[in-house]
Amino acid sequence: FSIGASYESAQQKMARGMAGSAVLSVKAANGAIKTDELPPLSSIEAGVGVLKGTALYHENGYYETIDLIAADLTELDKINPPHLANGEKITDFTGSLVILPDRFTLKYGINKGDTIHLQINGATVPLQAADIANYDTVFLRHTRGATALLPLSTMAGLLDQTDGYSEILIKPAAGADTAVLKNEISAALPAPAYIVSEVVNEAQIAADARQKSMPFFLISFFSMTMSVFIIYSSYKVITLDRLPVIGTFRSIGAEKKTVTRIFLLESLLYGSAGGLLGIPLGIVVLKLILHGMGQSLSQGIEIPAVISPLSAVISFTMAVSVAFLS
């Protein structure tokens, strides 16, 4: 359960990436879309226009795909503010500047103030690294490559798109239902002229998490079954080992039911001890597994361990049950 929940949490974080607290995306089927095309709905708290593009970075024989994004920083802060590595705010962000995530700059040895060259629309464009950002919010991604933030005016000039945006990200007002809001926007901006979609496909993320955790469910099931079988098949050996104890109990007048009850309490003690010791040990193993899974994801994102109280209770209950069934 914890592996699936942890992986799902990480995938949701990566999938949200640039969108942040926005839940819907609105695009024009052909060309750009303007923010004033959005209907004036009270259920919309913010509509942020975003320009998108792609570039290619070449260094020492390596090619890296760069996703370019640009937006009004004041508006972007409403849904997903970028975080600089030095903790400062983004200021004087105009001209041929670019902000890159720290994982990308560390990989290629890029420092603040360095000039990099990106191939955009077939032309080589020099850009100065204005700042280094943390690998989160708008720079977080679930595919390989990197994301770079450019000034809106610079991006518009490079893409020759000075009027409108690639998409508008919608942040709902407090208490607004996403499905209802989507229907309201779709009614005001009907298909096929506009495309209204949810930013995160929760069903797909949950399905991916189940697929990742299924092998561990099977391993746990077979391990538990084998434990019961091994202990049960060794019943005669255990009985012989307990004969002196049984004889002592019977010699002082203990009935068969009393002896059985004592051994069941012993099983309860062993099961409880195993559960209490196994849970912290399992947390350590879980973190090691998630670390390995995180390295297999693009950019090696760290998957935080998500351990719910229900998972701990189920683990403890299973430990006691195995002891009793054995």
PLM regions: where:
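Juxtamembrane helix-loop transition segments at the membrane interface in multi-pass membrane proteins
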Residues: 8, 12, 240-252, 286-295
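Interfacial "coupling" helices/loops that link adjacent transmembrane helices in transporter permeases
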Residues: 229-271
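Small-residue-rich transmembrane alpha-helices
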Residues: 233-235, 269-300, 310-326
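Interfacial loop-to-helix junctions that mark the boundaries of transmembrane helices
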Residues: 306-307
